[in-house]
Amino acid sequence: LDEDQRATLRSEKVGFVFQNFQLLPALTALENVMLPLELAGTQDAREKSEVFLARVGLGERLHHYPRTLSGGEQQRVAIARAFASAPVILFADEPTGNLDTETGANVVRLLFELNIEEGTTLVLVTHDTDLADRCQRKFTMSAGRLAEVL
């Protein structure tokens, strides 16, 4: 695949949740979720975004900017954004890395719930062995190479 084809594949089939959220500070929670949908030409971007923000417990925080949201709330906006585009596969890089224990547990619960409800393949990258133990399949890496399948 050339670069344009890879970009199309990523935008149509793949979702991402980053450790540092990657929210645009000048956009509200709602606008952060809507943006990739609008770029993809989704007709009901606003409605879909509102539904997913409600599903992650942020239905009352739609018009808040990232700087006014806690770390857990920002991560939930990122999760709503990722799932709203209905990806076939979702990559989550240390989804609880910047969160306290309780908030992290809530984010993990939410990720797995949406994973099941939406039928999305979820690929987690984590150093958290307890989180890894909840996954159906586990792989370890060493020096950038697949080292072991558990």
Which stretches of residues belong to each language-model region?
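H-loop (His-switch) and adjacent beta-strand-loop-beta switch element
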Residues: K138-L150
